[in-house]
């Protein structure tokens, strides 16, 4: 089972806020090791899929054979990869979500992606790193784990006997194959994350 902290939005400075165990709204008064009062946690669902399977088919026409194999999984949830860390450098690749982050006052009404905290904010707000760690493990960072994936697709051609006999071969075929070429369906929140 997956549990998350309840995200309550961004404050006027773009800092994430959460439901604390005592029922208050907070950015930094979050106890990650709480074992008694867990009323501030949200049950997201199972982490293991409840339905899994595959579907395959072979299509033949003249000398061509098309083989498709798909896998599917449904009924679970996944936590999105963390997007905030304690620091960034010029070499750090920024997540896509940062393009939609809080930049100016009022942005808290259009986005749920927090501001990248400045050095001043980190110095002025005690334990601000807690808010960003909590954001990474909040309910807004959870997606459905359902997917349908094209696992394998291949196209082969069996050359006719008239060609193979001239080459003194009993058979000749040419095959093109791709493994894991694309997802047919997954939650949009995943943005390519497996």
Segments the model singles out, each with a brief description of its role:
Residues 1-46, 87, 98-112:
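Conserved small-residue
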Residues 34-43, 95, 133-141, 194:
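Extracytoplasmic loops and strand-loop junctions of Gram-negative outer membrane beta-barrel proteins
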Residues 51-57, 64, 150-155:
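Hydrophobic, lipid-facing positions within transmembrane beta-strands of outer-membrane proteins
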Residues 61-63, 72-76, 152, 159, ...:
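Transmembrane beta-strands of outer-membrane beta-barrel pores
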Residues 63-67, 162-163:
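Repeated loop/turn-to-beta-strand initiation elements of outer-membrane beta-barrel proteins
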Residues 68, 174-176:
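Membrane-embedded beta-strand positions of outer-membrane beta-barrel proteins
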Residues 75-173:
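Extracytoplasmic gating/loop element in the C-terminal half of outer-membrane beta-barrel translocons
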Residues 107, 115-117, 186-194:
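Solvent-exposed, glycine/polar-rich loop segments of beta-barrel outer-membrane systems
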């Amino acid at each position: 089972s997956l549990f998350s902290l309840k995200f309550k939005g961004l404050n006027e400075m773009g800092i994430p806020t959460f439901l604390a165990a005592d029922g208050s709204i907070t950015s930094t008064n979050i106890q990650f090791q709480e074992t008694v009062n867990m009323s501030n946690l949200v049950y997201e669902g199972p982490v293991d899929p409840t339905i899994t399977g595959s579907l395959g088919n072979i299509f033949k026409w003249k000398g061509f054979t098309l083989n498709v194999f798909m896998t599917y999984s449904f009924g679970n949830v996944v936590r999105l990869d963390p997007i905030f860390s304690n620091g960034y450098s010029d070499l750090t690749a920024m997540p896509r979500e940062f393009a939609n982050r809080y930049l100016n006052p009022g942005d808290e009404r259009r986005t749920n992606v927090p501001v990248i905290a400045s050095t001043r904010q980190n110095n002025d707000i005690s334990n601000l790193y807690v808010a960003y760690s909590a954001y990474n493990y909040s309910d807004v960072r959870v997606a459905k784990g359902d997917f349908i994936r094209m696992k394998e697709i291949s196209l082969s051609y069996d050359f006719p006997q008239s060609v193979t006999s001239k080459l003194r071969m009993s058979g000749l075929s040419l095959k093109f194959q791709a493994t894991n070429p694309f997802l047919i369906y997954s939650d949009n929140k995943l943005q390519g994350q497996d």
